[in-house]
Amino acid sequence: VHLGFATYDMKLPAGQRQTNSVHIYIAVDELLELCRKLTSGEMRHRLAQMRKSEEKAPLYKCLGGTSAEKLQRIGRARSDGKSLSRTAELHCGKNADFLFVANSGPGETNKTGLIVPRFGNNPENHVAVSMSWDCFSGFMLTTKAHYEAWLAAWYTRQAEKPVQKKQEAPARVETPAETKYDDMSMF
């Protein structure tokens, strides 16, 4: 699932207002798990626990990005030669229920292929969106509904594709041994 986070400065001229942009890719299974936690009450319970204990860890964290090699291959290499790290975090909010944060900046690809952020507390792009419980729930469940509709349409298209005609099996050819024993009963 592709989520686009952006900030805008309305004082700038039209067409130049976007000041930060971070594209986050969340695996479908992770999105569905977040939706399950929302609908089951697990996330509301966890949110209450975190508020009570003043825990600062994110409720959800997604690490991603594009390797330096791929950036080079597609003609978008960074000037520092590093990978592009993208992170998304869902935090317990102070002024609203949630704070959904997306960051991007330099990263390094580790041995397993994970792109590890190397921007510390200073990302090149930072977008934070405060969301109420209802707003976040609506956003997640609407995204889930759209994914399910897309999946149903995909299956429908697959079912409508013409079936390839099966090749006819070659005619059975009798061997001399078969004709010799055709008249004999087995028992």
Protein language model features and the residues they cover:
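Terminal targeting/leader modules
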Residues: 4, 19-21, 69-71, 155
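Short, low-complexity cationic-aromatic patches
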Residues: 24-27, 89-95, 128-135
